[in-house]
Amino acid sequence: MNIDIKLHKDDLPDDIKLGNVIAVDGEFMGLDVRRDPLCLIQISTGNSDAHIIQLDRSKYNAPNLVKIFSDQSITKIFHFGRADMAHIKHYLKTDTNNILDTKIASKLARSYSDNHSLKTLIKELINIDISKQFQSSDFGGELTPAQLKYCANDVIYLHKIHDELIKILIREKREELYKDCLKFLKTRVKLDLALFKDDIWSH
């Protein structure tokens, strides 16, 4: 597959049109939201394209991104959006509205498996192998072509994967349960940022 990768500095261009359903991912220096800064945002329209935004970590001034994330009319597809949304909330100071999540969908649809990684879903649902070699990588500096391709792979398949998972959820009568889980996702992010890491429902 030929992927159209565009690297943007600081923010998306003012005149860009991405449509009403986008796939989103973020790259951080680690998983501790207070310690490990948000470095990149990747966005795809689902048409073999990836817009990779290298954020200015000295000020995090990205009004075009903020507008997209907060826009209720634009659907955002994540894979484990919990981590991405926490970093977006902490560094870009905005909620992310109108969310879908392939990891949550997979856990409800693919109850026959304990593996819900993006690599596994891409292989099983659309029969494409991707490399996760750069999953643990320094995204804080200049990006190599291999890193850019890795970042693109994290978003370009999310539309198709989500479509396939929804088919299973509908067949197994679990779609409403999925929708209810999505409603709680923003609250789960708020709990994470307030340092309530444990399952709030556990004994």
Regions found by a protein language model. Name each.
Residues 1-203:
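DEDD superfamily 3′-5′ metal-dependent exonuclease/proofreading module
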